[in-house]
């Protein structure tokens, strides 16, 4: 019985201490979730890991489009020639990211175009990875979580934190939606 294993690498990037994930299978087929790498050093650290592990990235999957989660999208898209996937309700948030970048002091941020819009409960299959897209709005209008059912792993973006829940004091956030998503 061959039982494939998935591997998960977490990076903490940018002044917001955002978590970026690389998830890949034994054959090296993988995805990057929420690339927040902004500085040259962060991008070099990311590239070094991908190269050392010989990972073939196939897609960028974003839980949402707040500035801390999108700072590295343009870099990753251009470096690895892979598509960006995002929920359609995040479009206004992504469109506002250039303004947010200026407000928060990221002058070199480049917004990236979305290549594929998520559908609710979509299953993304890449190599041995089967990733279910769960619509969990509240922290952001089109926030999604990624559920690796077989492994019982959820990557929830900013829905939950240790002993806390995601903030809802940003534009387009909704506390009631967040509570319903968590349930």
Summary of predicted features, one role per range:
Residues 11-13, 107-108, 113-115, 135-137:
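Short Gly/Pro-enriched turn/cap motifs at secondary-structure boundaries
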Residues 2-7, 102-106, 127-128:
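Short Pro/Gly-enriched beta-strand edge/turn motifs at strand-loop
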Residues 37-38, 100, 129-183:
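Metallo-beta-lactamase
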Residues 11, 23, 120-127:
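Short acidic-hydrophobic surface loop/beta-edge motif
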Residues 37-43, 47-125:
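Active-site HxH/HxHxD metal-binding segment of metal-dependent hydrolases
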């Amino acid at each position: 019985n061959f039982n494939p294993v998935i591997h998960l690498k977490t990076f903490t990037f940018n002044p917001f201490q955002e978590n970026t994930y690389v998830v890949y299978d034994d054959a090296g087929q993988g995805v990057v979730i929420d690339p927040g790498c902004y500085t040259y050093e962060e991008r070099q650290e990311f590239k070094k890991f991908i190269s050392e592990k010989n990972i073939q990235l196939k897609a960028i999957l974003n839980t949402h489009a707040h500035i801390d989660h999108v700072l590295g999208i343009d870099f990753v898209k251009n470096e690895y020639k892979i598509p960006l996937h995002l929920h359609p309700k995040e479009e206004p948030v992504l469109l506002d990211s250039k303004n947010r970048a200026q407000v928060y002091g990221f002058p070199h941020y480049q917004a990236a175009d979305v290549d594929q819009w998520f559908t609710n409960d979509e299953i993304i299959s890449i190599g041995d990875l089967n990733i279910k897209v769960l619509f969990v709005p509240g922290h952001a209008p089109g926030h999604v979580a990624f559920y690796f059912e077989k492994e019982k792993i959820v990557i929830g973006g900013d829905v939950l934190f240790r002993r806390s829940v995601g903030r809802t004091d940003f534009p387009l956030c909704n506390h009631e939606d967040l509570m319903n998503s968590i349930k």
